[in-house]
Regions:
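A short, flexible loop at the N-terminus of ABC-type nucleotide-binding domains that lies
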Residues: 1-10, 14-26, 75-79, 113
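The feature captures the beta-strand-to-loop junction immediately N-terminal to the Walker
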Residues: 40-42
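Helix-to-loop junction immediately C-terminal to a conserved catalytic motif
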Residues: 55
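Conserved coupling/switch loops of ABC nucleotide-binding domains, chiefly the family-specific signature
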Residues: 61-64, 216
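Conserved ABC transporter NBD signature motif
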Residues: 63-74
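ABC ATPase nucleotide-binding domains
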Residues: 85-87, 91, 95-236
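Non-catalytic connector elements of ABC transporters
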Residues: 244, 254-350
């Protein structure tokens, strides 16, 4: 990480598909060299358009894109894709079906002699865990293996940036976690900067060094996965990157806590006494207690997931139900009364 030669800087990027269809609206994004950044957002937010502009497949209406200080997009500048030092891993690998695995990986190694191409190809296949697969054809591989080959092909020419366009979508859920870990390890080993476009919150939080949440063509928040989850910029971000519990609250006299329908809650940052707003919590911060507790709730639903369960309760003073994550034996069922209290801190938003 922190290889400045591969820093990605996007400033003021704008792109519209007609006068009534703006997609990117002055988007700014900085990815440190060697980092894996996830671009996360709902369908239609502009994340794929961002990737295509960075790759050179689309022209921006305004703004700049620079990689390692070299301008790729800007006033009077539009480098063609083949001159950008960018590798691409598309959604389903898109391997050349008539070429062997080795020839797919070596496809971009132009200007090198045969021995160097062979050495680099073997190195990349070993890196992605496919040593010995060079003579196979794409149709002989599983979906996960095809994605590994696509990654090896993207990394072989030593790009400064690798773009991954929802590369795990077509894989079975049982395979995704393992493939994600392998892709992350391969990118780290080469030191390439990477941009992963995804709509999968779990994928973004578990894979990336930084996560940029896109909303309506702008970055709503760009942060580490931990800070994004624990200190969301606003209630919308909180709800998009995970289950959120939103509570009305009033800051207490000391400025360090707020009074809510679930009791007194500590704040992540001091606030002016008397200020009102919305507190953001996560379901795992809530605990079910004895029914005689100060704050009481009624269980309306229980969803069991194996590793944990989601217990939905109603609380007096709240218009919407509250979800509580419970591990271990379930102490309550629908219709039962229970106590509830908050652990940890909450962020306060206007």
């Amino acid at each position: 990480m922190n290889d400045r030669h591969n820093d990605l800087r996007v400033e003021g990027l704008a792109k519209s598909y007609g006068p009534e269809a703006p997609v990117l609206r002055g988007l700014d994004l900085t990815v440190p060299g060697g980092a894996l950044a996830a671009v996360l957002g709902p369908s239609g937010c502009g994340k794929t358009t961002l990737l295509r502009v960075v790759a050179g497949f689309l022209r921006a209406d305004a703004g700049t894109v620079a990689l390692g200080g070299r301008t790729l997009v800007g006033p009077g500048v539009q480098l063609p894709p083949e001159r950008r030092r960018i590798g691409i891993v598309p959604q389903e690998g898109a391997l050349f079906p008539h070429l062997s695995v080795a020839r797919n990986v070596a496809f971009g190694l132009t200007g090198t002699d045969r021995d160097e191409r062979r050495r680099r190809t073997e190195e990349m296949l070993d890196l992605v865990g496919l040593s010995g697969y060079g003579d196979r054809m794409p149709h002989e591989l599983s979906g996960g293996q095809q994605q590994r080959v696509a990654l090896a092909r993207a990394l072989a020419p030593r790009p400064g940036l690798v773009l991954l366009d929802e590369p795990f979508n077509a894989l079975d859920s049982a395979l995704r976690a393992g493939i994600r870990a392998d892709v992350r390890a391969a990118l780290r080993a080469t030191g390439a900067t990477a941009l992963l476009v995804t709509h999968d919150q779990q994928e973004a939080l578990s894979t990336a060094d930084v996560v940029a949440v896109v909303r309506q063509g702008r970055i709503a928040q760009c942060d580490t996965p931990q800070d994004l989850y624990r200190r969301p910029a606003d209630p919308w971000v909180a709800g998009f990157v995970g289950d959120a519990v939103l509570l009305p609250g009033t800051v207490g006299d000391g400025g360090a806590t707020a009074t809510t329908p679930l009791g007194t809650v500590a704040l992540t940052a001091p606030a002016d006494p008397g200020r009102t707003g919305t507190l953001v919590l996560r379901p795992e911060q809530l605990r079910l207690t004895d029914a005689g507790a100060a704050v009481r709730a009624t269980v309306t639903d229980v969803c069991f997931y194996g590793h944990d369960a989601k217990v939905t309760v109603t609380v007096e003073g709240l218009d919407t139900p509250v979800d509580v994550r419970v591990t271990g034996p379930l102490p309550v069922g629908p219709g039962r009364r229970t106590g509830i209290h908050v652990t940890g801190e909450a962020t306060l938003h206007p």
